[in-house]
Amino acid sequence: MPSTNRAGSLKDPEIAELFFKEDPEKLFTDLREIGHGSFGAVYFARDVRTNEVVAIKKMSYSGKQSTEKWQDIIKEVKFLQRIKHPNSIEYKGCYLREHTAWLVMEYCLGSASDLLEVHKKPLQEVEIAAITHGALQGLAYLHSHTMIHRDIKAGNILLTEPGQVKLADFGSASMASPANSFVGTPYWMAPEVILAMDEGQYDGKVDVWSLGITCIELAERKPPLFNMNAMSALYHIAQNESPTLQSNEWSDYFRNFVDSCLQKIPQDRPTSEELLKHMFVLRERPETVLIDLIQRTKDAVRELDNLQYRKMKKLLFQEAHNGPAVEAQEEEEEQDHGGGRTGTVNSVGSNQSIPSMSISASSQSSSVNSLPDASDDKSELDMMEGDHTVMSNSSVIHLKPEEENYQEEGDPRTRASAPQSPPQVSRHKSHYRNREHFATIRTASLVTRQMQEHEQDSELREQMSGYKRMRRQHQKQLMTLENKLKAEMDEHRLRLDKDLETQRNNFAAEMEKLIKKHQASMEKEAKVMANEEKKFQQHIQAQQKKELNSFLESQKREYKLRKEQLKEELNENQSTPKKEKQEWLSKQKENIQHFQAEEEANLLRRQRQYLELECRRFKRRMLLGRHNLEQDLVREELNKRQTQKDLEHAMLLRQHESMQELEFRHLNTIQKMRCELIRLQHQTELTNQLEYNKRRERELRRKHVMEVRQQPKSLKSKELQIKKQFQDTCKIQTRQYKALRNHLLETTPKSEHKAVLKRLKEEQTRKLAILAEQYDHSINEMLSTQALRLDEAQEAECQVLKMQLQQELELLNAYQSKIKMQAEAQHDRELRELEQRVSLRRALLEQKIEEEMLALQNERTERIRSLLERQAREIEAFDSESMRLGFSNMVLSNLSPEAFSHSYPGASSWSHNPTGGSGPHWGHPMGGTPQAWGHPMQGGPQPWGHPSGPMQGVPRGSSIGVRNSPQALRRTASGGRTEQGMSRSTSVTSQISNGSHMSYT
């Protein structure tokens, strides 16, 4: 365990600054116990520095649950430091000494429950309204700062000398709202606090409920169900209707106020701010109503203490003169005065207060008022002496000197016996005089009885404390499990998010790599095409040069041949003059040379036109090939994106299934834990109830045994009474016998005296025998009657107790059944809510997937459309330039058949079919040109899937050869077989709508 959590550890600076470092025993003197509870005790004390009267609440944090006690002390100190309001107790500081915290607060006269204890009757409605108004103002302050008191009752509402109402005992308070802890005092608990762990959280309205119960307490001297076992009261409050005021003497305003506070459903219950506007507290009332009540209470306390004082003086006086004697009369008198207090709200109920550090119902004597300080040293010494007397006698007697004089003057017997009183009486007088600054509305007998009850009811208090501790532990276990599962869920969610992010990053890297690869492919293809075009031009130029050389050689041969023929013709014709022959021959030579020059020029022109045409046609084929490559790359990229998106969606669905499985497993774990905790709680409740039943039966048996033990004494007394009556009867008969004997002896002759005496003796013996028989009969009848009456009374008490305990057990069973049903309903509701959340999340995920698929489809369509439009613009621009240069589109659309019959040296195979593309694009067969993808060319060859004409049989990737012959050029130029291409002005939109968009594979 960390040192900062160890009880009493001040290593944490935040905790250390909560406590003062001084020794409290040197700062505070004249300590006198004025209250006692489960936490410890409250003392009256005086601050030696300021001579100010204070109240000190001592809380030990040693022994069992020391860490829990220490945490409660820290929480209460922090709470007291935060609150500053006229209707809340003023905090002065906290000190530590020997594993005990000294919580110093302002001193108050007493609590509202002390008023009930002293007066033995309910308060007046106007007094209840004044007390309630002050308490409401304090609660409104707490609730406005999101704090909850959680232990409102008459014992925790204190009064000061000026009549101010103060809220005290914040050991159960919560600094956060809403809360869900099981704390408070059973009879004042709101239903939602009792069901806190089962049904969820609660807020400041629990204090409003407790205030309503407190109003009933002040109006009826005890809260509802106070005659019931505290545990049974919890079950009763949780499932039965709200209590109401029983008497009809209260006003409608008061009844409505109580009914509003005790609304079973918290949402229907008003807040403390709203209750401050209620007519019950706003009605006009005397300003001095509480001051007058306090004064009357102080007078009554003085009278009660004076009565006890006179008894003690009388007892001491008789002991001094007569020795020990049985004061039966005084015992009866004491019973008359003290017996009526047992029905009030005493510390038994308060000691059942749930928080271990809370002040009990009648021990709240720590509050505001600072009384006049002592003026002389003698008074201080007297007070120290008085303190010693009080602590040794475990009692508190409150009497001022003038009060003592007043009571002595009013009691002649006391005044007459005062000079003869022993030293003890003098010490008691000195003791009373020393308390002149100790004002209170609590009687000495109340403090003494409270201490005794605290010692006697330890078993019941320990049972309630154990139950409270169990509820706390269960709540802590549940919160620990929920936090653990939440951490597991967060970790799982982070892991899934990380996996998804990793996959997306991998996909992005793959896509970037693919795009770079495509860019490299395009660059490489551009270089290859440039080289191919250069080689193609060089090949044609080489062939044309070769053809030109051949042509020139043939012209030379033809020239020589023609020259020889002409010479032969001239030689045959001898009649022609030689000069004429020479001229004719020269002219023929010139004609031949001119014709050959024209033929050469025509050849060069045709070669140039052919070169330009074939280069232009080659460039168009290159452009179409690049377009096909772009289409293939775009198709590959889009298919890759589609594949990645499918994989991402599959992962999202798997993650959804994984999250769903984990959520259902967590919910099942929490519900199992909750069921187990409810089972343990119900088992503990049943065990506690059975122990309570056994204890009640044991107490009743003990009482009956005591009655049986006391019966011989009462029987002996009655037997002595009967015996006395018999003796009186015997004496009467003896006197009558003597009188009759004397009379008969006087009236009868002396000779008959013997017979008369004998007869009288027999008669007397017979009557005495009859009287003895009657005596025995009376004794036996009395014994049997008394025994029967005792048996019947005890049997009746046993039956009543059994019925009561059976009802409480049935109430517990009903409560537990209700809790189980509520838990099952809650589990079903949680399961339905989780299923709804999962279904909604699945629907949102599917909607997101559908939207992403639609967006991807739109992106694919847009990419294809933009690519087709760009390629169409490029082809159209190329064809326009060709038309400007004088080339026909039909001529450029297809190579001549002869062009495929030869290949130039060094020509490489194209990676794409320049005439028909690379097969089906976007899921449809392509035509010979990309003008209209997926449609046959009008007037031209069939699509690649149905080749025809001279193009049939050309393999993919075959080299393109061009037959360099004027005949081919002439045939092409003269309108030989050509293929009509489709115009590039065909609408791209119609192409896409007709099926040229992607077909996802």
UniProtKB/Swiss-Prot annotation:
UniProt region (Disordered), positions on chain: 324-380, 404-431, 567-587, 905-1001
Biased composition (Polar residues): 906-915, 975-1001
Low complexity: compositionally biased ranges: 350-370
KW Ribonucleoprotein (keyword) present: no
Record's subcellular location: Cytoplasm
Entry's Gene Ontology BP terms: central nervous system neuron development; DNA damage response; DNA repair; execution phase of apoptosis; microtubule cytoskeleton organization; mitotic G2 DNA damage checkpoint signaling; negative regulation of microtubule depolymerization; neuron cellular homeostasis
Activity regulation, short description: Serine/threonine-protein kinase activity is inhibited by SPRED1.
Entry EC number(s): 2.7.11.1
Residue numbers of Phosphothreonine PTMs: 669
Annotated positions binding ATP: 34-42, 57
Enzyme's top EC category: transferase
GO cellular component, one term: cytoplasm
Superkingdom classification of source: Eukaryota
Phosphoserine modification, residue list: 9, 421, 445, 965
InterPro entries for this protein: Kinase-like_dom_sf, Prot_kinase_dom, Protein_kinase_ATP_BS, Ser/Thr_kinase_AS, TAO_STE20_kinase
Post-translational modification: Proteolytically processed by caspase-3 (CASP3).
Molecular function per GO: alpha-tubulin binding; ATP binding; beta-tubulin binding; kinase activity; myosin V binding; protein kinase activator activity; protein kinase activity; protein kinase binding
Main location: cytoplasm
Ranges of compositional bias, category Basic and acidic residues: 577-587
The protein's assembly and partners: Self-associates. Interacts with MAP2K3. Interacts with SPRED1. Interacts with TESK1; the interaction inhibits TAOK1 kinase activity. Interacts with MAP3K7.
Function description: Serine/threonine-protein kinase involved in various processes such as p38/MAPK14 stress-activated MAPK cascade, DNA damage response and regulation of cytoskeleton stability. Phosphorylates MAP2K3, MAP2K6 and MARK2. Acts as an activator of the p38/MAPK14 stress-activated MAPK cascade by mediating phosphorylation and subsequent activation of the upstream MAP2K3 and MAP2K6 kinases. Involved in G-protein coupled receptor signaling to p38/MAPK14.
Record-given protein name: Serine/threonine-protein kinase TAO1
Designated gene of the protein: Taok1
